[in-house]
């Protein structure tokens, strides 16, 4: 009996030990903040998520800007976008909620707070690289707040990452002035360390990540919105008068205009949100397919408003030799979505070259 009891006791001890270990294991898709920020790769991963969430903001940017301003319209007026078009938007509608922008802000806040702590854990994470990462975080936060303040004027001002339930989730709105001052302060802080890069490895990264040029442009745009025109001109001149070899420059040859649309990331570009449908299925939300007015009303897509379509026709007539605004097969009359590509999608946003007016971009890159 004593022998049996000893065996049972040992078995129980093993079970309790296993149970304790099992309870300490975190879910595979969850990590606590203290366990995450260990290396430079962790910082890069959060920054990448910030850019990814910024790409997810594009449909909101179109809805709040082009759609609300009647540059584009939607034929189905019963949808959330249709209600925005009819000035019938409600706070409960996902199409008018700002949560995706605050996801970008949250990623940026996390990098700003925790990236400096990584230097104590990763000997290869030098201060220069950390400061470079901070400039990108400042840019992402500033750009997100600029979109928010231009559309809502007063929004909650969040500068700390949400890491636990102790953080408040019902924050009062801050004034437009406070938001704009934060953006300008962020840009100044990013530029003060001289860590903002002029280029990254690869064209897509140079145009798709925050560079010194993107920070100048963000500051100029923010000052313009704040009606601080002299400072706006100052930062615009930093771009226009730059002499660095890899600076953004106006195209010297008019015939190169198409490079801005395909393949994109041209020398004239300062910052572009990157899409890669081929390798990463990132085409969702891309604004590449916008139909002209008169397109089949059964499609679930944007179309240019009638005045915008007429303006495109006028420009096409005036500059026919340049074919700047030509659509597929020279038609401005939209047809059913089912017949794509034999329809009137604006060619320069979906074509593949100036000379070849029948080549179609089959992906939304």
Predicted regions and their residues:
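Bacterial Sec-dependent N-terminal signal peptides
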Residues: 1-28
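Membrane-proximal, proline-rich intrinsically disordered regions
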Residues: 19-66, 236, 256-258
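Proline-centered turn/helix-capping motifs that create local helix->coil transitions or kinks
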Residues: 21, 58-59, 148-157, 195, ...
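Short, surface-exposed recognition loops and adjoining beta-strand edges that mediate ligand/DNA contacts
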Residues: 34, 60-78, 158-160, 196-290
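Conserved, well-structured interaction surfaces
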Residues: 39-48, 52, 56, 77-152, ...
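Elongated scaffold/linker segments in the mid-to-C-terminal portions of large proteins
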Residues: 41, 47, 80-88, 92-95, ...
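Structural transition elements
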Residues: 167-178, 228
């Amino acid at each position: 009996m004593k022998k049996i009891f000893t065996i049972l006791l040992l078995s129980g001890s093993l079970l309790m030990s296993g149970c304790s270990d099992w309870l300490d294991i975190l879910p595979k898709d969850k990590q606590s903040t203290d366990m995450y920020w260990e290396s430079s790769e962790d910082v890069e991963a959060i920054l990448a998520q910030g850019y990814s969430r910024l790409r997810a903001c594009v449909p909101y940017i179109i809805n709040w800007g082009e759609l609300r301003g009647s540059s584009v319209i939607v034929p189905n007026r019963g949808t959330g976008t249709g209600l925005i078009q009819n000035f019938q938007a409600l706070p409960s509608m996902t199409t008018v909620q700002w949560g995706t922008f605050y996801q970008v802000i949250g990623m940026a806040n996390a990098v700003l707070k925790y990236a400096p702590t990584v230097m104590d854990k990763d000997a290869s994470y030098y201060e220069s690289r950390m400061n470079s990462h901070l400039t990108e975080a400042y840019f992402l936060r500033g750009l997100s707040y600029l979109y928010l303040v231009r559309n809502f004027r007063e929004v909650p001002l969040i500068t700390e990452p949400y890491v636990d339930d102790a953080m408040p989730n019902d924050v009062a709105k801050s004034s437009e002035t406070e938001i704009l001052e934060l953006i300008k302060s962020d840009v100044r802080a990013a530029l003060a360390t001289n860590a903002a890069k002029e280029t990254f490895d690869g064209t897509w990264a140079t145009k798709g990540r925050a560079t010194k040029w993107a920070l100048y442009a963000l500051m100029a745009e923010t000052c313009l919105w704040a009606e601080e025109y002299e400072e706006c001109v100052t930062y615009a001149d930093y771009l226009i008068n730059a002499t660095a070899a890899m600076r953004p420059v106006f195209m010297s040859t008019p015939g190169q205009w198409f490079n801005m649309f395909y393949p994109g990331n041209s020398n004239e570009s300062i910052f572009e949100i990157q899409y890669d449908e081929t390798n990463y299925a990132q085409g969702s939300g891309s604004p590449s397919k916008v139909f002209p007015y008169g397109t089949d009303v059964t499609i679930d897509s944007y179309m240019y408003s009638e005045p915008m379509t007429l303006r495109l026709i006028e420009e096409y007539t005036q500059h026919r030799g340049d074919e700047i605004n030509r659509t597929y097969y020279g038609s401005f009359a939209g047809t059913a979505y089912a017949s794509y590509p034999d329809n009137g999608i604006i060619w320069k946003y979906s074509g593949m070259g100036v000379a070849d007016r029948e080549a179609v971009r089959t992906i939304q890159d």
